[in-house]
């Protein structure tokens, strides 16, 4: 818990649960008759409603992007290092909106919330989702908040995919699109990692086809293993070497010692997986990794990303990190090259980092801070 709230923090924040009663037709062919979104906002919406900025979260993210829910909260929101007064996403300038997407497990309608037709948690019966479903629900959220056009839509990883989809689905409602550590579609290797993670969950005896809550069980082992698989892809070899090397947590290699040896990296992964399995839902993990796999920005444009980006009207900023092998700089360059060929305005930054894919979340990176600050400061908003 903080001893006091830092001066550059958004401070204590209260999430709000927003109700939407207009049916939402999903890409899978099913419909949500109604749904709820858990939302947090930071800063003040100006009189002209031109300073609104949307944050789209990644796979394990949620609405709590900045500030504290109480003085007892141990850590601030997941992107607190970059959101707040005087920070790159400056709340003195922007009205920032962050939400937990449909299918999430932090308050929005999803597998852990009641299915209106049964009164029981949706569980494994929750509809399959696509990135465009999230974008359409976010557009409804913008309408409810009285926001006709976002000054910017910002997202990292899966959030970057949402930002790009926004620029195509609602081209006249996005001023700037900030895409960080993302891609226009997953590689076969990325799909394989997601498959391995899902298999760990789906084959856990406690999963019960996604209806584990009705069996009073939790597929903790499967979800923990899935998290370990994913977490490995978020780190880099250099980063793990610098942080953990071959240091031991317990045990010894001394001759005559039979005690099991545990490396620091093993202990770290086990701790992270155990923590994750206590706060995340297995069905949500399955839903969101499938949405990742199914995303293909150019599919409906003849598999031509140039043709896809010709639909857009906004300006773009694309950022990648050299040690990110999950969403490598090559994937970001593909986005940039397509934007250039589509004659769209784009700024690209490729940053040196040892933090792997997680770099977009890590604080205390001066070049990342400066790049974001420089771009965001140039976004014009009316008084």
From Swiss-Prot:
The keyword Cytoplasm applies. Its main location: cytoplasm. Keywords: Acyltransferase, Amino-acid biosynthesis, Cytoplasm, Methionine biosynthesis, Transferase. It is found in: Cytoplasm. One of its GO terms (molecular function) is homoserine O-acetyltransferase activity. It holds the Pfam family Abhydrolase_1. It catalyses: L-homoserine + succinyl-CoA = O-succinyl-L-homoserine + CoA. GO terms for biological process: homoserine metabolic process; methionine biosynthetic process. The active site is at residues 157, 324, 357. It comes from the Bacteria. Its EC number is 2.3.1.46. InterPro entries: AB_hydrolase_1, AB_hydrolase_fold, HAT_MetX-like. GO terms for cellular component: cytoplasm. Residues 51-361 form the AB hydrolase-1 domain. Pathway: Amino-acid biosynthesis; L-methionine biosynthesis via de novo pathway; O-succinyl-L-homoserine from L-homoserine: step 1/1. The record marks 326 as: Important for acyl-CoA specificity. Substrate binds at residues 227, 358. The keyword Acyltransferase applies. Transfers a succinyl group from succinyl-CoA to L-homoserine, forming succinyl-L-homoserine. Homodimer. Belongs to the AB hydrolase superfamily. MetX family. This is Homoserine O-succinyltransferase.
């Amino acid at each position: 818990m903080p001893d006091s709230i830092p001066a550059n923090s958004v401070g204590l924040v209260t999430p709000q649960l927003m109700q939407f009663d207009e049916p939402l037709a999903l890409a899978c062919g099913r419909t949500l008759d109604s749904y709820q979104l858990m939302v947090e906002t930071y800063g003040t919406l100006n009189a002209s409603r031109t300073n609104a900025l949307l944050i789209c979260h990644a796979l394990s993210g949620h609405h709590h992007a900045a500030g504290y829910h109480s003085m007892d909260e141990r850590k601030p929101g997941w992107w607190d290092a970059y959101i707040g007064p005087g920070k790159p996403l400056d709340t003195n300038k922007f009205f920032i909106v962050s939400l937990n997407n449909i299918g999430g497990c932090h308050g929005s309608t999803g597998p852990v919330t009641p299915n209106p037709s049964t009164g029981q948690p949706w569980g494994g019966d929750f509809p399959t989702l696509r990135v465009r479903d999230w974008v359409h629900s976010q557009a409804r959220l913008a309408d409810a908040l009285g926001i006709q056009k976002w000054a910017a839509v910002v997202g990292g990883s899966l959030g970057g995919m949402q930002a790009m989809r926004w620029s195509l689905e609602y081209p006249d409602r996005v001023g700037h699109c900030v895409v960080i550590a993302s891609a226009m579609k997953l590689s076969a290797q990325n799909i394989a990692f997601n498959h391995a993670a899902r298999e760990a969950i789906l084959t856990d005896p406690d999963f019960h086809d996604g209806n584990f809550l009705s069996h009073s069980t939790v597929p903790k082992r499967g979800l923990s293993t899935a998290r370990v698989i994913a977490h490995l892809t978020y780190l880099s070899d250099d980063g793990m070497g610098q942080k953990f090397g071959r240091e031991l947590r317990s045990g010894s290699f001394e001759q005559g010692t039979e005690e099991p040896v545990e490396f620091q990296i093993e202990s770290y992964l086990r701790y992270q997986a155990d923590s994750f399995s206590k706060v995340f839902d297995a069905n949500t993990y399955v839903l969101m990794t499938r949405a990742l796999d199914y995303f293909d920005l150019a599919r409906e444009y003849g598999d031509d990303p140039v043709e896809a980006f010709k639909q857009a009207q906004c300006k773009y900023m694309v950022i990648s990190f050299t040690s990110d092998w999950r969403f490598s700089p090559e994937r970001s360059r593909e986005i940039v090259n397509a934007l250039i060929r589509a004659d769209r305005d784009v700024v690209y930054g490729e940053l040196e980092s040892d933090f792997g894919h997680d770099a977009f979340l890590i604080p205390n990176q001066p070049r990342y801070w400066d790049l974001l600050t420089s771009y965001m400061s140039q976004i014009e908003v009316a008084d």
